[in-house]
Amino acid sequence: MKTKNIMIVISILFNVVLFTYIYWRESHLKEMYSNLSFGLQGDLVQLESTIEYQNNNKWNDENVVLEKIEDVREGIHQLMVTGINVGMITKSQENDLWTLYRYFANFPTYTGFPNTKLENNDINKLIRLRDDLRSAGWGTNLGYSSDWASFSMKIEDLTN
């Protein structure tokens, strides 16, 4: 009887530790995923301010804008892959990210070489992108949130 009681106590303690670990791990994954979303929105704000800076300085270093667009694409990909791998992304969120990814596929790609010259048409598209980012809520001195509902609304505003 005494051995049975000891086994029950050990089993209860083990289960408490296991549930605590699972809860902590789930909380940690949610926080990490939220930080990725917040980081992507930070990249969008930096892209807006980089376009503004280049526009004010006669596009003297347009590769910086292309690098920022690449950062946004990588952020979208990282958020999507991480969300799928840890099972934290809903189908609606995945669709939002695909919409955003397709939207940014329409802009020039960073080649890795610092001598890329943008055509006037590309510059005009980027200026329009800056305006669209600001109107969606991603811009310098504009606040943004890490909750997905706000993020999703901004994606819809940007892509429509």
Which residue ranges define each predicted feature?
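N-terminal Sec-pathway targeting helices
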Residues: 1-15, 19
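Ser/Thr-centered flexible coil motifs
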Residues: 33, 90, 116-119
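Short acidic DE-rich linear segments
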Residues: 155-160
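Cytosolic/nucleoplasmic, non-transmembrane interface domains of endomembrane
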Residues: 113-125
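Transmembrane signal-anchor/signal-peptide helices with a preference for the extracytoplasmic
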Residues: 15-39
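Short extracytoplasmic/periplasmic juxtamembrane "stem" segments immediately C-terminal to an N-terminal membrane anchor
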Residues: 33-51
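Hydrophobic alpha-helical transmembrane segments and immediately flanking/interface helices
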Residues: 10-12, 23, 77-83
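Alpha-helical segments in soluble extracytoplasmic regions
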Residues: 50-108, 122-154
